[in-house]
Every structure is written in structure tokens, then in C-alpha cells.
UniProtKB/Swiss-Prot annotation:
Keywords: ATP-binding, Glutamine amidotransferase, Ligase, Magnesium, Metal-binding, Nucleotide-binding, Pyrimidine biosynthesis. GO terms for molecular function: ATP binding; CTP synthase activity; glutaminase activity; identical protein binding; metal ion binding. Mg(2+) binds at D71, E141. ATP binds at S14, I15, G16, K17, G18, I19, D71. The active site is at C381, H507, E509. It comes from Parasynechococcus marenigrum (strain WH8102). This is CTP synthase. The gene is pyrG. Residues 292-534 form the Glutamine amidotransferase type-1 domain. Pathway: Pyrimidine metabolism; CTP biosynthesis via de novo pathway; CTP from UDP: step 2/2. Allosterically activated by GTP, when glutamine is the substrate; GTP has no effect on the reaction when ammonia is the substrate. The allosteric effector GTP functions by stabilizing the protein conformation that binds the tetrahedral intermediate(s) formed during glutamine hydrolysis. Inhibited by the product CTP, via allosteric rather than competitive inhibition.
Length: 544
């Protein structure tokens, strides 16, 4: 039978609950326990698929095609375990399910209420993850901050959960902040005390407190916090600001987080094997020469909009003993200032995914610059589509070429709507989503990087390369290095005679892991290193 851990947050939002959940998952897995982590999000959207990346950050896509919160990316990267649509729950999806049941008559004419129906549905979702994941421990992160109206049904549900399982079968962790007041020169515990008081008022007594701070927390302060909050001093876990999120599991291990959780859950504290993770963090702290990578996007106001792309670049740099010098470049600014002005000196260019017309011409200009200047280039999703448009306009003689998404009346729709999308009306959850196989062509850059004939990648798109122009592109120098098994869909392209120019319709960033970088990103960084003045790089084949 699975054990359950619930992680709440107090004092401020963005306190780091997701990283704590992912770190605990890593520590449990290092002891031989199977782990699954789910996120309960308090917003009314059914999923984040239609939300603005500038408001919400990136949409992380699972293997089974769920559009989820970016925290699921942290869960997968830290635990190296694939999550599913069951691991992402929103208030909107809960209410939708309950209302659908009411319409079907499942409640036999009863009055449908927040308690017990909404809270019961929430508890059922948590049990469902346990039943379908074969996990020894299910970790649940509750979004929002204790005291928010939106989070109350979730908090009530996890309070009720103690009636579903034994008290030794669940643990409550509360992540909180100890602010430093400069004028008094001390950390303050009062916000934490009030946050725990709020949590206790709804019937939840935390077993462990994870206290975020930017400076050392003394033993005396830990005793004070524990005394006021009803938590043993040893269960007050300091979590100081780290130079990298990948250092957090090691810090929490040193402070005894996993030991305390296992004690509450009455589980054996097996020996932990974190050697590979320690080596990873050592490499992060002792990087080689920096490579300058330009990320050309339209949502750069919020870095989280491209979180998985940035992490994939970091993973590749770790593997290549390089330091990532990331330059955020606004695609719209390229339209006004020119690519040369903003990209000069870059060792590589990445154009990630996106939607709509805004910034597209800037992306196309960046791609042309990378192609003509022979700078390593990687395009992702819309990045591939804009690479196709750039080639069509500047090399294939189709000066009016574009995507049907951008101009439905274009005479040359080199990118067009997938046939199965023709009659789709709703926006949410209707794209080509999830894992699909891709057949890699022999004697290509892609085959050298992947070292395999068939790979499986995650997708999120409605538009695809228009095969009516396929022969024209092939004749003019484009290489289709990856396609669907039936050959119908172009999934991966590259250019002959360029040091590194490739673009894919899928999202390889979702499959990159700290100790196992994605081949396309590692290949990009390896190619970028070749541009450094004095940094000999081993051939990428020797890395595998």
C-alpha cells in the first residue's frame, strides 16, 4: 500500500514547493522507493494549455499528451520518472468532473456541494495516482499559499485524507519563508508561526517544516520555530538559497528531510545513493569555458515560459563540461534592430516554440543569420516551421511563403494545418499531443546524434510541413532527417554543408534529464564549443 506526502506553502507564493517535492522524490528514489508526484493547482482552467506563457510559464507535455504545469517537468527531471495526465489536477478539472457526474445523475438527486463532493473528487484523484503508478510514496504538491480562498477545497481534502489512510501512512510538509529584516539585522519567525496557525485552524498539523532563507538558521531559531509550531526541532529543515536547483536535494539530504519523512511514514531509511547527483552538482560548480547561446523568443518577459529549453541547455553543458552563457533575445527587437546587432558573437542560436504572428519575422531573421553565418542552430516546433519559411523565401524562390496559421490566404503555405485538425473547434487539449515515433534517416546528423533508427518524442502542435513542397526543398538542399513511420509527416530537418543546422517539429526539451541530456541539445553545445578559440572538444560519439 502506498504512503502519502502532502506539501503546502505559506507566507508567500513561489516559495519553492515544486523543487522541495521534486527533491524529496529524488531522495526517496535514491533509497530504492518508487515515487510519483502530482500537482493540485487551484485555478479554474481545466488545464494550462490555453493560458498565456507570460502569465503561467511553459506548458509541460506528458507522454500521454496532457498539457500540465511546469512543475511536472521538475518532477520528471529530478526523479527520472515519467508522469501522466493523472499527475496534474486543477480546480477546473475537478469541478468539470463533478458537474458531469451531476448531469449524468450519478448523485441520485442529491445536493452537490463542495464538501463532500468536490473534496471527495480531489481525494479520488490522489488515490488514482497511487493505484496506477505502482508508487511506494505519492507526493502531492498543493498549489497556492495557505490562507488563499482558492486553495481551501484542496486543503480540506488533504485533511480528510487522514481518514482514508492511517496516520502513519501520510506526512504533511509545510514550506515557509523566514524573511530577513535589514534594519533589525535578524531573521523573523512570526510569518511562519502565523502560517502554521492558519494551517492548524483547518485541522492540519505539519510534521515537517522546510524553512526558506537567504542566510544560516541557528539551532536556537530552529528550537523556537519548533516550539511555537508543534514540530520537533530536528523536523525544522533549513533550505538556504542555492546557486542551482540541482543542489537542493543534496542540501535537504544533509539537513535530514528524507530521514524525517521516512520516520513519520514508518518506512525504513535505506542507504542513499546520490553519487551520480553529487557528480552532477560538482560539474555545475566547476564548469569549463562558456558558450554563448541566444534564445530567440517572444515570451522572454517571463523566463519560465521556456523553462524546459533552458534546463535542456544546462544538461547539455554539464555533459560537455561547458558553462552556459544564455542571452535572452526578443524576436520583435530583431525586427527593429536587425539580427546582426543582437546576435553578433553568439556561439549558437535556439528558436523555441510559440503561437501567432508576433515576433515571427524576427525569428526568421535570426534563422537566416545563423544559416548564413554558419552558427549552430536548433529550432523547436515553431522554430522548425520558421526555419522552413526562411528557406522557402530566401533559397527556394517562394518569396511569399509562410504558414497557413499566420496567413490563411498565402499562395505558398509551406506549413499547413494537419488534416485531422480541419474540423477541430475547441482550443483546449485538441492539438497533436504526447509521444509519437519518429523514423531517423541514415547517414544524417540526426542519426549520428541519436544513434538509433526510431526515437520517441513529445509533440504539441496543429501545423506541419506541407508535403506539396517536399521535393522542392529536397532538391534545394534540405534534408528530411526524421519523419513519421509512414513517411507522411516531416518531423526533423537539417541542412547539408552547415556545421550544425537542425530543427524538429516536436519538443525534445521535455525528455532531457540532468544526467542524460537530449542528443539534439548536446549536439548543439558540442558544435558551439567548436567555435571557441581554444577549447578542443572530443567527438560527440565518444560521449556515448
Amino acid at each position: 500500500m502506498a504512503k502519502f506526502v502532502f506539501i503546502t506553502g505559506g507566507v508567500v507564493s513561489s516559495i519553492g514547493k515544486g523543487i522541495v517535492a521534486a527533491s524529496l522524490g529524488r531522495l526517496l528514489k535514491s533509497r530504492g522507493y518508487n515515487v510519483s508526484i502530482l500537482k493540485l493547482d487551484p485555478y479554474l482552467n481545466v488545464d494550462p494549455g490555453t493560458m498565456s506563457p507570460i502569465q503561467h510559464g511553459e506548458v509541460f507535455v506528458t507522454e500521454d499528451g496532457a498539457e500540465t504545469d511546469l512543475d511536472l517537468g521538475h518532477y520528471e527531471r529530478f526523479t527520472d520518472t515519467a508522469m501522466s495526465r493523472l499527475n496534474s489536477v486543477t480546480t477546473g478539472s475537478i469541478y468539470q468532473a463533478v458537474i458531469n457526474k451531476e448531469r449524468r445523475g450519478d448523485y441520485n438527486g442529491g445536493t452537490v456541494q463542495v464538501i463532500p463532493h468536490i473534496t471527495g473528487e480531489i481525494r479520488e484523484r490522489i488515490h488514482r495516482v497511487a493505484a496506477n503508478s505502482n508508487a511506494d510514496v505519492v507526493i502531492t504538491e498543493i498549489g497556492g499559499t495557505v490562507g488563499d480562498i482558492e486553495s481551501l477545497p484542496f486543503l480540506e481534502a488533504i485533511r480528510e485524507f487522514s481518514g482514508d489512510v492511517g496516520r502513519n501512512d501520510l506526512a504533511y510538509i509545510h514550506v515557509t519563508l523566514l524573511p530577513f529584516i535589514g534594519t533589525s539585522g535578524e531573521l523573523k519567525t512570526k510569518p511562519t508561526q502565523h502560517s502554521v496557525k492558519e494551517l492548524r485552524s483547518i485541522g492540519i498539523q505539519p510534521d515537517v517544516l522546510v524553512c526558506r532563507s537567504d542566510r544560516t538558521i541557528s539551532e536556537e531559531m530552529k528550537r523556537k520555530i519548533g516550539g511555537f509550531c508543534g514540530v520537533p526541532t530536528r523536523a525544522v529543515i533549513p533550505s538556504l538559497d542555492a546557486e542551482s536547483i540541482y543542489a537542493v536535494p543534496l542540501t535537504l539530504e544533509q539537513e535530514g528531510l528524507c530521514r524525517e519523512v521516512l520516520d513519520v511514514l514508518d518506512l525504513t531509511d535505506h542507504d542513499s545513493d546520490m553519487a551520480a547527483w553529487q557528480e552532477l552538482v560538482h560539474k555545475l560548480r566547476n564548469p569549463g569555458p562558456a558558450v554563448k547561446v541566444a534564445l530567440v523568443g517572444k515570451y522572454i518577459q517571463l523566463n519560465d515560459a521556456y523553462l524546459s529549453v533552458v534546463e535542456a541547455l544546462r544538461h547539455a553543458c554539464i555533459a560537455q563540461d561547458a558553462s552556459l552563457d544564455l542571452h535572452w533575445v526578443c524576436a520583435e527587437q530583431i525586427e527593429s534592430d536587425g539580427a546582426q546587432a543582437l546576435l553578433k558573437g553568439m556561439d549558437a542560436v535556439v528558436v523555441p516554440g510559440g503561437f501567432g504572428n508576433r515576433g515571427v519575422d524576427g525569428k526568421i531573421a535570426a534563422i537566416r543569420w545563423a544559416r548564413e553565418q554558419r552558427v549552430p542552430f536548433l529550432g523547436l516546433c515553431l522554430g522548425m516551421q520558421t526555419a522552413v519559411i526562411e528557406w522557402a523565401r530566401n533559397q527556394a524562390g517562394l518569396t511569399e511563403a509562410t504558414s497557413a496559421e499566420l496567413d490563411a490566404g498565402t499562395p505558398h503555405p509551406v506549413i499547413h494545418l494537419l488534416p485531422e485538425q480541419q474540423d477541430v473547434v475547441d482550443l483546449g487539449g485538441t492539438m497533436r499531443l504526447g509521444v509519437y515515433p519518429c523514423r531517423i534517416a541514415p547517414d544524417t546528423l540526426a542519426h549520428r546524434l541519436y544513434g538509433d533508427q526510431v526515437v520517441y518524442e513529445r509533440h504539441r502542435h496543429r501545423y506541419e510541413f506541407n508535403n506539396a513542397y517536399r521535393n522542392l526543398f529536397l532538391e534545394s538542399g534540405y534534408v528530411v532527417s526524421g519523419s513519421s513511420p509512414d513517411g507522411r509527416l516531416v518531423e526533423l530537418i537539417e541542412l547539408k554543408g552547415h556545421p550544425f543546422f537542425t530543427a524538429c517539429q516536436y519538443h525534445p526539451e521535455f525528455l532531457s534529464r540532468p544526467g542524460r541530456p537530449h542528443p539534439l541539445f548536446q549536439g548543439l553545445i558540442e558544435a558551439a564549443q567548436q567555435r571557441l578559440p581554444s577549447s578542443p572538444v572530443e567527438a560527440i560519439q565518444t560521449q556515448r
